[in-house]
Amino acid sequence: MTYDEALEYIHGIYWRGSKLGLSRTREILELLGNPQKQLKFVHVAGTNGKGSTCAMLEAIFRKAGYNTGLYISPYIIKFNERMQYNGEPISDTDLAEITEYVSTFAETMQDKPTEFELVTAIGMEFFKRKKCDIVILETGLGGEMDSTNIIDVPEAAVITAIDIDHIRELGGTIESVASAKAGIIKAGGDVVYYGNNPIAANVFATKCAAVGAKLSIVDFESLNVKECTINGAIFDYTVNDSLYENVHIPLPGTYQSRNCALVLTTIELLKKKFDISKEAVIEGIASVKWPGRFEVLCRKPIFIADGGHNPHGIQGTADSIRHHFQNKKVMVIMGVMADKDVSPMLDILTPLVKSAYTVKPNNPRAMDPELLAEKFRERGIAATAYNDIERGVACAFNDARPDDVICALGSFYMYNDIADAVKKLTCELS
């Protein structure tokens, strides 16, 4: 099987649909000899901030000298990013070889796996072969019925910020979303929650009490942000009498220091089981890279790409715009999935927007850009719709002055097209 054949095989699974339950994942992993049982995990669920949190945790473990695995979704640029070893995506050769190996077992199953279940099995086999010391494992959707939830008790279960998202699958209340995420909490385990919502916190506390798990909630009162610029933040944070001073996180966005506080709270728990020095923590955070999170793609005009795609995520983007650009109104390029309730997101954005360029992300679930443009117009914002992302970006650049700010947001699925379009425009890259 070649690399292209492997991708064709993986993506060809989609027609089998999205089906609830862990039975298929368990079956294929059993056929593979249960590679996950030879690994240790930090399991990460939540609505927003999962990717950045996973990236920071992986970087810290790697700086501490551990061989790391990282499992994430969705990928941003290339599929191989879904599973990484020591900070590098799986090679084309390894992906082809392991996919062919796993496919021989998948084809024997009467109830065939979904795409995500197949990829999870490929990832587990990859991490086993690489003999990872620790795998940072991000859920795909929810928690309880997510195919990553076939692992035993993880070294820590980490739950990032909770908000209403994926209403069809997770329900339309904070309690229903939190209940799904709480599925990664296992008997006797350590659990760390970001702590942004008291309703969610109560759900997690109840689940922890029921199964004998220990819950820690991030203390943002102990977070002192000294500096926050478009180039990142510097802050102090105290957790369990450990003071982390002058921590530099190179990821822009005012929300990243809070994500980092979640990571530091988790690391303090993990120090009981792993040899992680304060130097490794500081160096790991300082080295982290994560595209599409309030990322500056261009300086004149300033062009920012952000993956915010639900009210909490958009609020984080809006807060960052206010912090970095004060009273300046921005030009927005936005594309979303059709199943999103965009009204709360637009209500947050509208006071900051002077013009909107709506586009269609490269995904069959994408919302018609004209429908999104009309929703902007209903709020008094001039908006133009484009089916082609490159044309939308080009028109925004054409309308922008050198001191303007353009922000592309609404879906991670359009990041690659946005970045490519910006590169094609000969703007002054930083």
Positions of the model-derived regions?
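Short functional linear segments
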Residues: M1-G46, T53, A59-Y66, Y71, ...
